[in-house]
A protein has these predicted regions:
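Hydrophobic cores of alpha-helical transmembrane segments in multi-pass integral membrane proteins
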Residues: 18-45, 55-118, 130-142
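Transmembrane helix-loop junctions at the membrane interface of multipass transporters and ion channels
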Residues: 118-124
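Compositionally biased amphipathic helical and low-complexity segments enriched in hydrophobic
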Residues: 5, 124-127
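Extramembrane terminal tails and long inter-domain/linker segments of multi-pass membrane proteins
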Residues: 1-17
Length: 142
């Protein structure tokens, strides 16, 4: 142990693995979502042709994904610091991860398979009045 790594801050292997899973996933999602943002900027600059429906799907996934990904990474950081003061459950931490990933898959399925493109804010009337662009099921999944 050293002053930089006191004994009470070293994670047991299973907890270190869970925290690494969260952080690697957060970084991977941020990279994918940055690519979505870059594609939108390239389309706006006429460097790349992106159909309007795909543009709004990218915008929806980018916005909702950035907010959610920051929440995922933030929960990992909070768990790391809070565990020194409160007894936290590793199974609950992993359950949170699984539920988050399930939500991310549903969001992506609604956006790219169901063609949902109502924007990340999900403001009325877009989710309800899609003008035939996406289904009610896609809006419900989102």
């Amino acid at each position: 142990m050293s002053a930089l790594h006191p004994g009470n801050e070293i994670l047991p292997p299973r907890e270190r693995g869970a925290l690494t899973l969260y952080l690697v996933t957060t970084l991977a999602l941020l990279l994918v979502l940055m690519v979505f943002g870059l594609l939108m900027r390239m389309a706006q600059g006429t460097w790349l042709h992106v159909p309007p429906t795909l543009f709004y799907q990218l915008m929806t996934a980018h916005g909702a994904g950035m907010v959610g990904t920051v929440a995922l990474g933030g929960s990992a950081v909070m768990w790391y610091f809070l565990r020194k003061y409160v007894s936290l459950s590793l199974p609950i931490f992993l359950t949170n991860y699984i539920l988050f990933m399930l939500g991310a898959v549903l969001l992506l399925a609604a956006t790219f398979l169901g063609h949902y493109a109502g924007g990340w804010t999900f403001l009325y009337p877009l989710p309800v009045k899609s003008m035939g662009i996406w289904s009610v099921g896609a809006a419900a999944l989102f």
